């Protein structure tokens, strides 16, 4: 069984390999002589510290929920496929839903360390590997507002017919 140090070194090596794909980070490493892995881990640590102690927590978490999803949404709009369009449209609907609920109940006032939990939620919602936005949409948003859209929507009717056809088989 590998020791913790061996596993940490392996993870750092994998992260370094992944970060090597970005020329900006390679240039930064050459200019500063600081390994790009340590720069990213340091910035991530500072970011987490600021969010944890709510030093601009709202701004930092909203940036996390906005910058990367916006990039991927624009990428999806310029791609030929439609699956990624649906994924990011679902993300934005769920993100907007949570933003409205957050404002309505003054969540940061009532929940300690709210922005740490929101950051984890935003990551879970946004990462395609987790399908968080689709899970929340199908289990929470769709039951609440779906009945207002299914009757007149052609895509909803087609979706219902496809679901019925797959269930009958």
Swiss-Prot record:
GO cellular component: endoplasmic reticulum membrane; Golgi membrane
Predominant subcellular localization, coarse grouping: endoplasmic reticulum
UniProt KW Endoplasmic reticulum keyword: yes
Keywords annotated in UniProt: Endoplasmic reticulum, Golgi apparatus, Membrane, Transmembrane, Transmembrane helix
Entry membrane topology: Multi-pass membrane protein
Subcellular location: Endoplasmic reticulum membrane; Golgi apparatus membrane
Residue ranges, Lumenal side: 56, 104-105
Stretches of the chain found on the membrane's Cytoplasmic side: 1-35, 77-88, 125-169
Comment on protein domains: The short lumenal loops between transmembrane domains 1 and 2 and between transmembrane domains 3 and 4 may impart a wedge-like configuration, thus deforming membranes.
Function per UniProt: Required to generate and maintain the structure of the tubular endoplasmic reticulum network and the vacuole. Induces high curvature in membranes and causes membrane tubule formation. Involved in membrane/vesicle trafficking.
Family listed: Belongs to the DP1 family.
Protein name: Protein yop1
Gene name of the record: yop1
């Amino acid at each position: 069984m590998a020791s913790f140090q061996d596993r940490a070194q392996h993870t750092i090596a994998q992260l370094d390999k992944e970060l090597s794909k970005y020329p900006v980070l390679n240039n930064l490493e050459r200019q500063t002589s600081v390994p790009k892995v340590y720069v990213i881990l340091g910035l991530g640590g500072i970011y987490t510290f600021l969010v944890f102690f709510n030093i601009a927590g709202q701004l930092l978490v909203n940036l996390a929920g906005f910058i990367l999803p916006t990039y991927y949404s624009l990428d999806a709009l310029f791609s030929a496929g439609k699956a990624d369009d649906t994924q990011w449209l679902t993300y934005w609907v769920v993100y907007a839903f949570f933003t409205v609920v957050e404002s309505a109940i003054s969540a940061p006032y009532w929940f300690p360390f709210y922005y740490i939990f929101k950051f984890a939620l935003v990551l879970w919602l946004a990462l395609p590997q987790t399908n968080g936005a689709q899970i929340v949409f199908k289990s929470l948003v769709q039951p609440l507002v779906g009945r207002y859209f299914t009757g007149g929507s052609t895509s909803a009717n087609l979706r219902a017919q496809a679901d019925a056809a797959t269930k009958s088989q």
